[in-house]
């Protein structure tokens, strides 16, 4: 594997650990040239369904987009990175369990909201207020009232 620091092509695995949930393997590697260490993660290569946007365009599923939107909603909230990662894992498991080749972006958004609601009610409201594109304050009040119950 190529060293991210110096670009040398020969690195050595110095430590390997399996995650607690056995979903991925963490490896510590050391470069043969600069001797710096770095971490890599290996996970199974699975085919996620394509995401169908509202306008009909199809895009590949992008984990980074889900993580980014969840982190934005959870900004300055008492939720750890590990909890966010676990929530994304749940979303991905549900996506794969659908067994579909294509999933509407609205369905993916609902899965994200479901996980955010479990993690943090404020983050859920933040995400839903943008995702659902409320037309007026009454729609927002209704959402807040639902969450407050």
Curated annotation (Swiss-Prot):
Alphabetical list of Pfam families matching this protein: ATP-cone, Zn_ribbon_NrdR
Name of the encoding gene: nrdR
Record GO terms (molecular function): ATP binding; DNA binding; zinc ion binding
Domain ATP-cone: start-end pairs: 49-139
ZnF region ranges: unnamed: 3-34
Cofactor(s) of this protein: Zn(2+)
Protein name, entry field: Transcriptional repressor NrdR
The keyword Zinc appears for this protein: yes
Chain coiled-coil ranges: none
One Gene Ontology biological process: negative regulation of DNA-templated transcription
Function comment: Negatively regulates transcription of bacterial ribonucleotide reductase nrd genes and operons by binding to NrdR-boxes.
Family indicated by similarity: Belongs to the NrdR family.
InterPro entries in the record: ATP-cone_dom, NrdR-like_N, RNR_NrdR-like
Lineage of the organism: Bacteria, Pseudomonadati, Pseudomonadota, Betaproteobacteria, Burkholderiales
Keyword set, alphabetical order: ATP-binding, DNA-binding, Metal-binding, Nucleotide-binding, Repressor, Transcription, Transcription regulation, Zinc, Zinc-finger
Cofactor binding notes: Binds 1 zinc ion.
